[in-house]
Swiss-Prot record:
Organism: Human papillomavirus type 6b
A matching Pfam family: E7
CC terms in the record's Gene Ontology section: host cell cytoplasm; host cell nucleus
Lineage: Viruses, Monodnaviria, Shotokuvirae, Cossaviricota, Papovaviricetes
Chain ranges for the short sequence motif LXCXE motif as given in the UniProt record: 23-27
Protein's recorded name: Protein E7
GO molecular function terms attached to this record: DNA binding; DNA-binding transcription factor activity; protein domain specific binding; zinc ion binding
Length: 98
C-alpha cells in the first residue's frame, strides 16, 4: 500500500490453501518414571559400603589392634555388638601362642 488512502488495487489476496502438515506423532515414548523407580530400588537393594576403622585391644596382651573393614552401616553395627559380646580380637604377636 502506498499513500494515505486504501484502495482495492493495493490489497493482494493469496487464496492458495497452505500445504497440509501432519501433526500426528507416531512415536511411542518409554515411561521414564519406571526407570527412575528401578534406579531407586536398585540403590536400596545394594546399600552403600564404606570403610570403617576399628580400634580395640588384643585379648592376650592388651595392646591396641587396628582393623579397617568395608561394610554397610548395618553390618558395622553387628560387628560392634559382637565386639561388645563374646568376640575377641587377637594381635599378630599373640596369634601363634593361642
Amino acid at each position: 500500500m502506498h499513500g494515505r488512502h486504501v484502495t482495492l488495487k493495493d490489497i493482494v489476496l493469496d487464496l492458495q490453501p497452505p500445504d497440509p502438515v501432519g501433526l500426528h506423532c507416531y512415536e511411542q515414548l518409554v515411561d521414564s518414571s519406571e526407570d527412575e523407580v528401578d534406579e531407586v530400588d536398585g540403590q536400596d537393594s545394594q546399600p552403600l559400603k564404606q570403610h570403617f576403622q576399628i580400634v580395640t585391644c588384643c585379648c592376650g596382651c592388651d595392646s591396641n589392634v587396628r582393623l579397617v573393614v568395608q561394610c554397610t552401616e548395618t553390618d558395622i553395627r553387628e560387628v560392634q555388638q559382637l565386639l561388645l559380646g563374646t568376640l575377641n580380637i587377637v594381635c599378630p604377636i599373640c596369634a601363634p601362642k593361642t
